[in-house]
């Protein structure tokens, strides 16, 4: 399931993030440092070094925002979230086709299974040319270039790439989530069911039917979830 989540960061948060990243200086390093065996040969970008003060500060801003975002919670069903990273593409930089690594190691040494990949756009689309996130999924090839503050979530199993940036700079945050439900198909069904329940709540539909659907949702989540 590929899902666009709008307005994850507000204007004030975007201003703060951009200001801190503009001032990051030597914290920007070669992005190949975090790429795996498959990704390193096709990756040309810059990243904020992991575990630096600016990475932790801005990562906390993003984590606080997604924890309050009901659409993100419903669609992703997060169990563990990898600390957000930040990248920059400019001057022809790109990231060729690749699939994200299956496992990342959290700062505390705990391993995280990458079920869901997340990109949060920090630059406005008008500020750069190129830089589309191209995702190949079961419905074909999707090109993604969203307003600043908006997020795209998609299965980490997807083949994807970032096209060359030919003007300006494309700055974004990216990270991975281990979901309570590892199957994308099952997560999508639960998301559709939760969306239907919310619509029933808003329409004041038959309460017995609504309670029944809520019960089915939680029983499926209980059956499929891993904690």
UniProtKB/Swiss-Prot annotation:
Disulphides: none
Positions of Fe cation binding: 98, 100, 160
Class of enzymatic activity (EC top level): oxidoreductase
GO molecular function: 2-oxoglutarate-dependent dioxygenase activity; iron ion binding; L-ascorbic acid binding
Keyword terms: Dioxygenase, Iron, Metal-binding, Oxidoreductase, Vitamin C
Top-level lineage group: Bacteria
Free-text comment on the cofactor: Binds 1 Fe(2+) ion per subunit.
Binding site for 2-oxoglutarate: 170
Limits of the Fe2OG dioxygenase domain: 80-179
Known cofactor(s): Fe(2+); L-ascorbate
InterPro entries: Oxoglu/Fe-dep_dioxygenase_dom, PKHD_C, PKHD_hydroxylase, Pro_4_hyd_alph, Pro_4_hyd_alph_FE2OG_OXY
EC annotation from Swiss-Prot or TrEMBL: 1.14.11.-
GO biological process: DNA damage response; intracellular iron ion homeostasis
Annotated protein name in UniProt: PKHD-type hydroxylase Bphyt_7102
Organism of derivation: Paraburkholderia phytofirmans (strain DSM 17436 / LMG 22146 / PsJN)
């Amino acid at each position: 399931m590929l899902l666009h989540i709008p307005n994850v960061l507000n204007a004030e948060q975007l201003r703060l993030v951009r200001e801190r990243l503009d001032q990051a200086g030597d914290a920007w390093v070669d992005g190949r440092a975090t790429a795996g065996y498959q990704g390193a040969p096709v990756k040309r970008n810059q990243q904020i070094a992991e575990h630096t003060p600016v990475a932790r500060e801005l990562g906390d801003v993003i984590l606080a925002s997604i924890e309050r975002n009901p659409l993100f919670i419903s669609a992703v069903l997060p169990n563990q979230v990898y600390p957000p990273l930040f990248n920059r593409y400019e001057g022809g930089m790109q990231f060729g086709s690749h699939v994200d690594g299956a496992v990342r190691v959290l700062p505390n040494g705990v391993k995280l299974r990458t079920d869901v990949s997340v990109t949060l756009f920090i630059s406005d689309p008008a500020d750069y040319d190129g830089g589309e996130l191209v995702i190949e999924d079961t419905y074909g090839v999707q090109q993604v270039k969203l307003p600043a503050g908006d997020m795209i979530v998609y299965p980490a199993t997807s083949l994807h790439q970032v096209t060359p940036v030919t003007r300006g700079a494309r700055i974004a945050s990216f990270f991975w989530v281990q979901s309570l439900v590892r199957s994308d198909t099952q997560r999508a069904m639960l998301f559709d069911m939760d969306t239907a329940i919310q619509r029933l709540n808003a329409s004041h539909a038959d309460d017995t039917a609504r309670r029944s659907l809520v019960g089915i949702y939680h029983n499926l989540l209980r059956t499929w979830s891993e904690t």
